[in-house]
A protein has these predicted regions:
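Extracytoplasmic copper-binding redox domains, predominantly the cupredoxin/blue-copper superfamily
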Residues: 7-246
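Sec-dependent bacterial lipoprotein signal peptides
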Residues: 1-5
Length: 246
């Protein structure tokens, strides 16, 4: 098992669901007998910044969904310093390999007048399924620069929106044009090797071919960090990241 730890102070969308299909015999096949994994955790040190209260008064249904009180989620740190909603992915080391997109859709829900999840990943060509669980109308607007930008209103009980991203792009900010406090971020990658840190700061990337990789982490307020790690045959490695507060 390898172990690496680091720290730092800072650091085409909307295409039809059947586009970008590629012959299966061109895809790289991972050998399960030699594949490894990466696990780790993201932590925040220093003074924990206070979370700002969000004013949802423009929509009473949103206020009611939070019992009258809602707080900013751009930096979620628990009492032990665990940092949630950090996007973790393999940035370098997979060049020359083409991976088949998962046939399992990635779901983003508009629930409680938030996007859930706030941070997510999807492969190029993988279905993004957008649903609205709220009793109010929302508008999902991914502000892509490499992929095609789009926005679409979705009322209560409307059918899911089905979209795909065609090109890699990290990260694409998403907003709701109706509710100004609603934000999310999606990382689009040409491979399945990404994760999002949980509430306890942990993450895991599985089924990774042996090799040397650059692992990158992204947090919407704290920026990016990069670390290099080598995965041996059928081995696991641990890599931790620390963001330092002021």
């Amino acid at each position: 098992m390898a172990f690496i730890s680091g720290c730092s102070k800072k650091a085409e969308m909307g295409s039809p669901a059947n586009s970008g299909i590629q012959s299966s015999n061109t895809f790289f096949q991972v050998d399960a007998t030699t594949a490894g994994s990466i696990t780790g955790a993201i932590r925040f040190t220093g003074k924990k910044p206070p979370r700002k209260r969000i004013d949802m008064s423009e929509d009473p249904a949103c206020v009611a969904a939070h019992g009258g009180v809602a707080y900013d989620e751009s930096l979620v740190v628990d009492a032990k310093g665990a940092l949630a909603n950090v996007f973790v992915y393999v940035e370098k080391g997979l060049e020359g390999k083409t991976f088949e997109a998962s046939d399992v859709p990635v779901v983003i829900d508009q629930r409680g007048c938030w996007f859930r999840p706030r941070v997510l990943g999807v492969q190029t060509g993988q279905v993004l399924r957008v649903i609205n669980s709220d009793p109010v109308t929302h508008n999902i607007h991914p502000m892509a620069e490499v992929n095609r930008e789009w926005n679409h209103s979705q009322g209560p009980g409307d059918d899911p929106l089905i979209r795909k991203f065609i090109k890699p792009e990290v990260m694409i900010p998403i907003k709701c044009n109706i509710h100004s406090w609603m934000h999310a971020f999606v990382g689009v990658l040409p491979h399945p090797y990404f994760s999002v840190s949980k509430e306890d700061g942990s993450f895991e990337i599985r089924n990774l071919p042996p090799g040397t990789y650059t692992i990158t982490v992204w947090q919407e307020r704290l920026g990016v960090q990069h670390r290099e790690i080598t995965i041996a045959r059928h081995a696991s490695a641990v890599i931790n990241f620390i963001y330092e507060g002021k």
